[in-house]
Amino acid sequence: MAKGDSFLSTPEKTPTGEEKRHLRIIITNADVELNYVVVSVTTLYHRNIQDCSCILQKSDHNFIKHKSIVDFKRTKIMSSVEIANGILKGLLIPKDSVRDDVLQRIIEAAKKSRYISTEIKTMLV
């Protein structure tokens, strides 16, 4: 996996109670311990409640079907082993990489996000 690559998460419960897979995007190169920063994309439902600091359109990635946001509250560090094993076991589903311009927009918004921990922000250099 590499910076800009994407995959679908394991099924997760949505606020409506149904289970859906969310698009995850790797936004860093691997660090010395082979860990990546991974963000989650979700449909924009409530502009006044959700963090709209990084809105994505259908044209930004072929998996996105509706106006969506990068949900920085769900940003996490994932190891290369965790991602590779998830893909091998069919838990994670690889998708197309994001375009460079979209990736840069996500990274810039992540650097400013109040929802991302200092630990994770240090990896965004």
Q: Residue locations for each model-derived region?
A:
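Loop/turn positions that initiate beta-strands
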Residues: G4-D5
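C-terminal terminal-subdomain/extension
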Residues: D60-V125
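Compact nucleic-acid interaction/catalytic patches
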Residues: P15-N62
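Beta-hairpin (beta-strand-turn-beta-strand) motif
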Residues: E12, V41, T75-I77
